[in-house]
């Protein structure tokens, strides 16, 4: 089961390392932070940078929730596990499949490329293929697409790298 832990923004990597160090691998199968690639121009050249896909969240894969909660008590800086009310619930299968489709096993959403035809976006390559309907806006200058997706039981905005090759 995939669980999501809310932490203070900026402390995600520290919390991930703490979880891996303090919680037994028998309990915590995997702890990760999904990233996305973004192109940024500095020193006259384009560079690909990696940014956190969901700032303030760390993802955990574990089968036994009770043991996971006991292990997380040792982790300092944890805000809460995401759930409904007081109940901790795992991500639903559609959310897990979406994360695996766009981020693969590396949990890294690579740059997509596309074109704009008649004021409509068409993705030519990359993980955003087939997700054109989720794109709410595009910042062509920063090479970022803003998507609206269902995650954590609510609609969230997600930023991913998108290079528009041409506009027709």
Predicted stretch roles:
Residues 1-120, 148-168:
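Acidic-enriched and Gly/Ser
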Residues 49, 122-124, 136:
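Residues embedded in well-ordered secondary-structure elements
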């Amino acid at each position: 089961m995939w669980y999501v832990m809310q932490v203070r923004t900026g402390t995600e990597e520290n919390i991930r390392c703490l979880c891996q160090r303090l919680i037994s691998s028998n309990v915590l199968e995997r702890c990760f932070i999904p990233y996305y690639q973004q192109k940024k121009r500095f020193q006259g050249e384009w560079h690909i940078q990696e940014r956190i896909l969901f700032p303030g969240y760390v993802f955990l894969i574990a089968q036994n929730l009770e043991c996971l909660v006991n292990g997380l008590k040792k982790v300092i800086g944890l805000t809460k596990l995401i759930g409904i009310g007081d109940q901790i619930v795992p991500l639903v299968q559609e959310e897990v499949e979406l994360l695996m489709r766009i981020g693969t096993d590396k949990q890294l959403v690579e740059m997509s490329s596309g074109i704009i035809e008649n004021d409509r976006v068409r993705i030519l390559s990359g993980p955003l293929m087939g997700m054109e309907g989720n794109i709410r806006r595009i910042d062509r200058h920063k090479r970022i697409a803003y998507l609206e997706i269902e995650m954590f039981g609510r609609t969230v905005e997600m930023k991913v790298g998108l290079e528009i090759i041409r506009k027709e």
